[in-house]
Curated annotation (Swiss-Prot):
Belongs to the polysaccharide synthase family. SUPFAM superfamilies: NAD(P)-binding Rossmann-fold domains. One of its GO terms (molecular function) is UDP-glucose 4-epimerase activity. Keywords: Isomerase, Lipopolysaccharide biosynthesis. This is UDP-glucose 4-epimerase. Epimerizes UDP-galactose to UDP-glucose. The gene is capD. It catalyses: UDP-alpha-D-glucose = UDP-alpha-D-galactose. Its EC number is 5.1.3.2. Pfam families: Polysacc_syn_2C, Polysacc_synt_2. The keyword GTP-binding does not apply. One of its GO terms (biological process) is lipopolysaccharide biosynthetic process.
Amino acid sequence: MFVDKTLMITGGTGSFGNAVLSRFLKSDIINDIKEIRIFSRDEKKQEDMRIAFNNPKLKCYIGDVRNYKSIDEAMHGVDYVFHAAALKQVPTCEFYPMEAINTNVLGAENVLSAAINNKVTKVIVLSTDKAVYPINAMGLSKALMEKLAIAKARMRSPGETVLCVTRYGNVMASRGSVIPLFINQIKQGKELTITEPSMTRFLMSLVDSVDLVLYAFEHGHQGDIFVQKSPASTIEVLAKALQDIFDSKNEIRFIGTRHGEKHYESLVSSEEMAKADDLRDYYRIPMDGRDLNYAKYFVEGEKKVALLEDYTSHNTKRLNLEEVKELLLTLDYVQEELKNA
């Protein structure tokens, strides 16, 4: 599917971009693909990536998704786009909501418009569980990003750019996530700061995140949203699992929820579950393709919305302490930190 094709990853110097490159370099994809373009703002991270991967098919472009001209020029000749550029720290976005809008909404508008303008074949937009029933600025901005993608998908004709969305739960050990924080606190002999012990979060690995995007890339139709079924854990169990793994006796201190945090997250709303396709490891939420001429739907009838439960970190499979430890030990990041402990 990537033979002689050019792929662009926006925000490509982040955890997801590095995971994609690592996957491709370990497979035949790197032999098939024509070029991988990393589009991001940080020249230092791009230089680090060039040195780390050392592959002539990797090309780095300095630019900002907030600037349409820079993303449009970088997208010339691109076949596929994985749009990962985002502001994702919930408390930060609470203090700077317009910055979240500028990157997550207006930046996404620029990426999608540039993709359509450059006749890109397919775009996969990376979203978050916080976009479902959003209560914080980050989630609201990502929800609007999803709406932008679906609205543009609805207006595409057959043969035009296909736009799909993937929703993530918490990606373990990704940049800015809680696992690196806990490990750092353990190594420094500090208290482990837990916001709310009963708070639950979905647990996805970086491998899972790449799997989800590649699944959506291979199977997605116009306007589809894809969600990977994931287990969950309470924050307290996650912290205790890391204590056991690192043989730590650090005290745990409860500090209360931060700005904009939810007690649990949702990956699929109850309304979406009514029309979702269960694909064993994934849910596919097809686009509502109706137009604004609602009169014909009243005449023809429309399948009513079923009263189904939403898919949340409270009602998915809950991992116990040993299961969380087993999952954490599969992460390369945790293994590296253990070696350096």
